[in-house]
């Protein structure tokens, strides 16, 4: 996934009004956390005098916020950097300067190697040092080539600017909020512990303050983010240890915040308090992304997942017992080293047993530096491709079945943005599906009562039937 993120205009006090403002173009690859990080870097640069452009050729600074989760991710970045190098040279011939920066997990993994392989790059900055971006960019403008890839994660959240009310309102009625970063699980296929570091949880007060700022800016729904978001822990009142369930309950007390979600979860960190939140919290949407990766105990052990297929299924049953309306999503990897036809059949059996509302599935890709890269019995590409085709066909069938079962249901719908057709808006169902409905643009941010009338391939259609809970 890529997303182009443009900064919003800076305020006049950000710089001399007689000097043309510098323009920045941010391209975001990968997960929701990168989208969140791009927004926060954008806020920091905006306060330093940068303004938006969604036209690459206009940019004085181009920043690629990268993802390293899949094979050849770094090579794709280098390919993009080659194109940017050519643009930089063309602008230099016209007497115009353009700096290039690389952020995100490729920056963390590659570090100085990026400067060696891509001499046009001026700045490399890892995920834990985004608060240093404005200063690093000032240094880069003097000709210094910058690499900032240490793990000062505590400083990052302390020093990044709080969400700006005007910018928040312009970004929409839903928002991401990172509460946890890093991973201590060390699954053998995954680079995250090496690019994002150890698990670190943000303090309660800091999270609540940011959530309140978002709500002040018109946000109605917040999704809490973390590499292992349900590993979040912090100190509550009187020093009591809090888990994610406690944090959700505290955020649920914020007036004006209508909905909460969280992602991504690890099965081992789904504790009783969090499961209970799915029963008792009306604001917590009945949707859970709970990756399992494989249905084979042998492969799960090789992946270092530290749970069995039976334990995963038992956990799903516990959660559905308290929230029968739950939509479950998952992640799957096919073709992990040593995976046999029988192992793959175990995965299909698990998928049948769970009946996912949606899921994400991928062929195993070797990640340099991970234990999985050293394993023997690598599965041939054609075998991986065939297994992925079979698995995705089953998952698509389940997703369509879930969507069709929604037809006729009445739900509360948060209207998020204009639809593709005139007079149409799009919102998200409680189960995260896009829902199209005829409504006025002035109703964006409202929660309306609708009846689902049709299930399309990738979205639902609805008619309005009830009163509006207006956005304040």
Swiss-Prot record:
- According to the UniProt record, what class of enzyme is this? transferase
Amino acids binding [4Fe-4S] cluster 2:
183, 187, 190
Q: Binding positions for [4Fe-4S] cluster 1?
A: 31, 67, 105
Q: Which domain of life is it from?
A: Bacteria
EC numbers, comma separated: 2.8.4.3
Query: What Gene3D superfamilies is this protein classified in?
Result: Methylthiotransferase, N-terminal domain, tm_1862 like domain
Which residues belong to any copy of the MTTase N-terminal domain?
22-142
Q: Which cysteines are joined by disulfide bonds?
A: none
- State the reactions this protein catalyses: N(6)-dimethylallyladenosine(37) in tRNA + (sulfur carrier)-SH + AH2 + 2 S-adenosyl-L-methionine = 2-methylsulfanyl-N(6)-dimethylallyladenosine(37) in tRNA + (sulfur carrier)-H + 5'-deoxyadenosine + L-methionine + A + S-adenosyl-L-homocysteine + 2 H(+)
- InterPro entries recorded: Elp3/MiaA/NifB-like_rSAM, Methylthiotransferase, Methylthiotransferase_CS, Methylthiotransferase_N, Methylthiotransferase_N_sf, MiaB_methiolase, rSAM, rSAM_horseshoe
Q: SMART domains, alphabetically?
A: Elp3
Q: Which UniProt keywords apply?
A: 4Fe-4S, Cytoplasm, Iron, Iron-sulfur, Metal-binding, S-adenosyl-L-methionine, Transferase, tRNA processing
Instruction: Tell me if Lipid metabolism is a UniProt keyword of this record.
Output: no
Intracellular or extracellular location(s): Cytoplasm
Q: Which PROSITE patterns match?
A: MTTASE_N, MTTASE_RADICAL, RADICAL_SAM, TRAM
Cofactor(s) the record lists: [4Fe-4S] cluster
Every copy of the Radical SAM core domain together lies at 169-403
Q: How is the cofactor bound?
A: Binds 2 [4Fe-4S] clusters. One cluster is coordinated with 3 cysteines and an exchangeable S-adenosyl-L-methionine.
Gene Ontology terms, MF aspect: 4 iron, 4 sulfur cluster binding; metal ion binding; N6-isopentenyladenosine methylthiotransferase activity
Q: Where is the TRAM domain?
A: 404-466
SUPFAM superfamilies cross-referenced by the UniProt entry = Radical SAM enzymes
What family is this?
Belongs to the methylthiotransferase family. MiaB subfamily.
Per UniProt, subunit arrangement is:
Monomer.
General function of this protein: Catalyzes the methylthiolation of N6-(dimethylallyl)adenosine (i(6)A), leading to the formation of 2-methylthio-N6-(dimethylallyl)adenosine (ms(2)i(6)A) at position 37 in tRNAs that read codons beginning with uridine.
What is this protein identified as? tRNA-2-methylthio-N(6)-dimethylallyladenosine synthase
